[in-house]
Amino acid sequence: MKWMIVEKAEELANVSYQLLKQEIVRHPEGLTIGLATGSSPLGVYEEWRKDRVDCRHVTTVNLDEYVGLSPDHPHSYHTFMQEHLFDAVDFKESYVPIGSTADPREESDRYEALVRQLGIDIQLLGIGSNGHIAFNEPGTPFDAKTHVTKLTESTRQANQRFFDRLEDVPTEAITMGIGTIMEAKKILLVASSERKAEAIRDMMEGPATTDCPATILQRHADVMVVLDEEAASLLSDEAKRTGRAAYTNFMK
């Protein structure tokens, strides 16, 4: 696992986007990027929209979708992606699970097969304050494939800001599993704010345990973590020095 700690919080999105752009430019023959939703990637998508790099050779696959929400629902992740990225960037193909399907488990199997067929070259991730990645909550087996999951109360409360009321936040989601995510060739995880500091410390310096799903990333061969100072605040002094030095070298 490699990591960078950016000097200023506002640089987090640009640095993260530049890492993605390197892959987009490096692979004109075709590239599959796994995309995330929530607050963590918003700045990255804003940088992407402004840059308008040619992505007609890029296929995207999203991590998850709420069960019960149709693609045109204002709070679906289909709509989220359309508003924050897809309406400004022309991709070859873009895929998001269908949350309004009559059989979410069948849709999970279909989506798992699709992801396996495409193969993810680089996966963009955020991290929850409880260490979840995608909607893989604490306790999810490390070998889990795409599945239907029940959302914890803390996750629903964290996502309430995207809805009018807590009661409107769905209780289930279709999500790529931890095992599915780990099959990506590269992983880019972006985290900011003190609210993520404990999860980041556990992910980077704690033991690999399903109590903090993101700790599995310690076992992946190619992970880059981009943090602001607040998210990195609980890391060891040595880890902070390493992350700051990596950022300095990247910016040269």
From Swiss-Prot:
Q: Which GO terms describe its biological process?
A: carbohydrate metabolic process; glucosamine catabolic process; N-acetylglucosamine catabolic process; N-acetylneuraminate catabolic process
Q: Name one GO molecular function term.
A: glucosamine-6-phosphate deaminase activity
Q: Which SUPFAM superfamilies match?
A: NagB/RpiA/CoA transferase-like (SSF100950)
- From the UniProt record, list the reaction(s) this protein catalyses: alpha-D-glucosamine 6-phosphate + H2O = beta-D-fructose 6-phosphate + NH4(+)
Listed InterPro entries: Glc/Gal-6P_isomerase (IPR006148), Glucosamine6P_isomerase (IPR004547), Glucosamine6P_isomerase_CS (IPR018321), NagB/RpiA_transferase-like (IPR037171)
Q: Per the similarity annotation, which family is this?
A: Belongs to the glucosamine/galactosamine-6-phosphate isomerase family. NagB subfamily.
Record-linked NCBIfam families: nagB (TIGR00502)
Q: What is this protein called?
A: Glucosamine-6-phosphate deaminase
Q: Which organism is it from?
A: Exiguobacterium sibiricum (strain DSM 17290 / CCUG 55495 / CIP 109462 / JCM 13490 / 255-15)
In the UniProt record, the gene name given for this protein reads nagB
